[in-house]
Amino acid sequence: MQFQHPHAPLYAPAPAPPAHPTPFYIEDILGRTGSSSGPVVPTPTLPSPNSSFTSLIPSYRTPIYELTPIHPVLSQYASMYPFQRSVGDFAHALIRHDPLGKPLLWSPFIQRPLHKRKGGQVRFSNDQTIELEKKFETQKYLSPPERKRLAKMLQLSERQVKTWFQNRRAKWRRLKQENPPSTGKREAEDSDTRRLSDAAARARELESGASTDSEELLDIEDEHQFTL
């Protein structure tokens, strides 16, 4: 009869480590203390982003780098905006914008009587248009001395005044055709008087050497039709 040795272990011995240990055991992560039977080939692992930094300065970890809790008063506002963006997202916000348009070529404080459009057309100012309209109400045609005097007063050229009156007469005839006047005797007399005065002014303008463009020729034909 055999007796168990008093110093024999009560449990079965632990299994021997494998011949080819893997780097996933706890011993491999914490560092092996015992010797292995064969050479172990180290397996390259990618360190974490902060592992090298924290391993170099373990003694400089002070509470200043730790996150501080938000004040209770401010925490309620932080919960209202959970998706806050960092400042880096807006670092190049201005660069992404398209460049501004063309710079200002004129100052609004500079008084310019004339503004040219495309095609050589002239844009008259409000004061010039008002004075020209007043003159047109009393006189549809201008003699050369009157045109010269009006151009000098409005700081325009005679050609500009003449062109404005040509366009204004064309508009006046068009409106008159769209809205013909009544056949009353008084209105007919007034129309005849205005027509005769316009014809006289036109005759003076032709005698003084005014231009004979197509628009002015239409005015002459209209006057002949009225006098027939």
From Swiss-Prot:
Tissue-specificity statement: Expressed in embryonic endothelial and blood lineages. From late-blastula stage, expression is restricted to the dorsal marginal region of the extraembryonic yolk syncytial layer (YSL). By the onset of gastrulation, expressed in the entire dorsal half of the YSL. Post-gastrulation, expression appears in both anterior and posterior lateral plate mesoderm by the 3-somite stage. Posteriorly, expression is in the intermediate cell mass (ICM), which contains both endothelial and blood precursors.
UniProt subcellular location: Nucleus
Ranges of compositional bias, category Acidic residues: 213-222
GO molecular function, one term: DNA-binding transcription factor activity, RNA polymerase II-specific
UniProt-listed GO biological process terms: anterior/posterior pattern specification; cell differentiation; determination of left/right symmetry; digestive tract development; dorsal/ventral pattern formation; embryonic hemopoiesis; exocrine pancreas development; heart development
Segments of skewed composition (Basic and acidic residues): 184-207
Keywords: Developmental protein, DNA-binding, Homeobox, Nucleus, Repressor, Transcription, Transcription regulation
GO CC, alphabetical: nucleus
Positions of the UniProt region annotated as Disordered: 175-228
UniProt name for this protein: Hematopoietically-expressed homeobox protein hhex
